[in-house]
């Protein structure tokens, strides 16, 4: 059996490892990057840490795993009738296909986002921003989007300015009525307090109408800023949106059945799946484990139990020694939250990357 897996994030790597360990046949992992980016240390390069510390090559992860081909390529089409996926130059036949491409930025149709904002999705983005800020530390900064990415990055930026003995002028903007809208109201309240304690201004119920090179046009005014960071809006990967005739789409996610199957012999896992656990690293790993086990059961003629994921663990750090973590109405915050989050990340990263690299990624300031 040949399983093709698209996506080199948590879900894709974990599914590959699980299937390879059970010797299910040939496995091809296709990723458009040779690296797995370690989000735990992503923003630490603001403090000047080497980018090498924050990424691990896929070839290193699978160096001692047999039966796995790692391919750096970009799949642009899927033909489920013929069980083939294609890149620009290569056709890959599959018996089982696992899609875990993650999500991509969405400018939400707002003029100027693409040309006048900076992204913070990968290491190169962060490094580029740091170098830009070093040229003029006095320029105002606006972060559009008060979800986990925007909140975390606001805290990291504030600490960086403090470390270089500068005063940051950071404004966090969101169209909603609270920060961290997918978390509990307690999380929003505590996170807002922490952000304000760090000197970060919060503008809520402010929808962005247009982005210019020197300011943001809102529904009720203008905010001047030359460094404008986009942390709002994401959508499905083109490999999904180009093939909606095969997939059901609900709330900007791919519909899957009780076994995470979106089409015959095609499974969708990770952030882009409409399933419990979507959007979290913990959920991505659990989905990957489930799909691998289900495929093995199918090979053996056994039935699988329907997919079910425990309530999500949600967490967000604000600075290097403060974090908020919640699950099922129970939460911790502050220094204890930071320690708890570190333990959770330690468990997750050690499931997919070698021990030495995991330690380096999880201790970016050491």
Predicted regions and their residues:
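FAD-binding core/adjacent interface of flavoenzyme oxidoreductases
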Residues: 68-142, 218, 229
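C-terminal auxiliary extensions adjacent to catalytic cores
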Residues: 320-366
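FAD-site-proximal beta/loop scaffold in flavoenzymes
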Residues: 114-137, 224-289, 293
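FAD-binding beta-loop-beta segment adjacent to the flavin cofactor pocket
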Residues: 251-267, 304-307, 320-330, 337
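A Rossmann-like FAD-binding core segment of flavoenzymes
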Residues: 70-73, 77, 162-255
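Beta1-alpha1 glycine-rich phosphate/pyrophosphate-binding loop at the start
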Residues: 1-68, 152-182
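Internal hydrophobic alpha-helix adjacent to the cofactor/substrate pocket in enzyme cavities
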Residues: 162, 282-315
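Predominantly flavin-linked oxidoreductase catalytic cores and closely associated redox partners
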Residues: 113-198, 202-204
